[in-house]
Amino acid sequence: MELTTRTLPTRKHIALVAHDHCKQMLMNWVERHQPLLEKHDLYATGTTGNLIQRATGMDVNAMLSGPMGGDQQVGALISEGKIDVLIFFWDPLNAVPHDPDVKALLRLATVWNIPVATNVSTADFIIQSPHFNDAVDILIPDYARYLAERLK
């Protein structure tokens, strides 16, 4: 597939997602990095987003709860170029009924080449990157070219 460039803006659109057993870990991470996160636009699945709003007072665009379609809503935003970073603390030791949605979310983040953290260490690396508050060019699939080729 041909690639094109997308610029992640200085003010990032960050999706925050956490499975039930990982919500407190994400809450602790968000509270620790609140001064940095306040400079960006936050999105989250339903329960996680509401917990973050309640604990920090930050504005969060809360989707539906993950099992009710929230993971798919975040995935749709990624494929539309509306999410720049995904912080997704998922529980690798417990299966969830919406595992296919989880896999789809991670697949879309990979397809669209956005930074993804699935644990605290990686999330720290991303937020502490010297590029976190800069505009950054990434390579993404050239969907217009892809579609044109398929419609020949």
Swiss-Prot record:
Binding site for substrate: 19, 23, 45-48, 65-66, 98
SUPFAM superfamilies: Methylglyoxal synthase-like
Active-site residues, record numbering mapped to chain: 71 (proton donor/acceptor)
EC number: 4.2.3.3
Regions annotated as coiled coil: none
Its job: Catalyzes the formation of methylglyoxal from dihydroxyacetone phosphate.
This protein's name: Methylglyoxal synthase
